Curated annotation (Swiss-Prot):
Transmembrane segments: none annotated. It holds the Pfam family SERF-like_N. It comes from the Eukaryota. This is Putative SERF-like protein. Signal peptide: none annotated. Residues 1-53 have a biased composition (Basic and acidic residues). GO terms for cellular component: cytosol.
Length: 60
């Protein structure tokens, strides 16, 4: 006789376990300093675009 949903429960438990194992890991393989530098550059570009848009909006 089979045990019903035992396979489904084991699958759900394993999926949760795998999700917990990979939760905090990053896939970009950057150091903290590299990540900070990359993020800072992106924010500078974003701020520059915003300032240009504001300047273009006020000069019309």
């Amino acid at each position: 006789m089979t045990r019903g949903n035992q396979r489904d429960l084991a699958r759900q438990k394993n999926q949760k376990k795998q999700a917990d194992l990979t939760k905090g890991k990053r896939t970009d393989n950057l150091t903290v300093e590299q990540r900070k530098a990359r993020d800072a550059e992106l924010m500078r570009e974003k701020q520059k675009k915003k300032e240009e848009a504001a300047a273009a909006g006020t000069s019309k």
